[in-house]
Amino acid sequence: SRRGLHEGYISGAKSVNPFIKVLSTYHPGELTQAFVDPEWGAATAKQAIDKGADVIFGAGGLTGNGALQEVATQSGVYCIGVDSDQWNTVPAARPCLISSAMKLITPAVADLISKAQSGSFKGGNVFGAAGLAPFHDFENDIPKPLKDLLVATKAGLDSGIIKTGYGN
């Protein structure tokens, strides 16, 4: 959910810098419009950059893609994609795209199908796997201690030791 991505991003940012200022904006339109407005995404990303943002997490379908594409036209600003490896789905964002927060839907669905077939699926809310896309052109720019921190953080989130404040 958008709220989950938002809370997770803020929790992660504050875990490395408790004094960080995170700017957040949600599309003001109906849900049917919120994910299909790349112009709004681009304009909102530009406003955040003008307010000093140096990283834009562009979540929200085509709206988020518009944000990523805007960030790619700016210098000294980075972006993070969402849902899949947006290096592949939004090539125009490559100049700024550090990584993407990926919803690993295919393995999660395969696991659910397997459990349903074996009779071990109990129903209820199921949270699938998530991951981080490769750093691609930024691979050599990310220091090893930061990469190690990301691996440890993912393990902590998966095990439940680390909480984001959303849904737990």
Question: What is each model feature region?
Answer:
Residues 1-168:
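A residue-level marker of the well-folded mature domains of exported/periplasmic proteins
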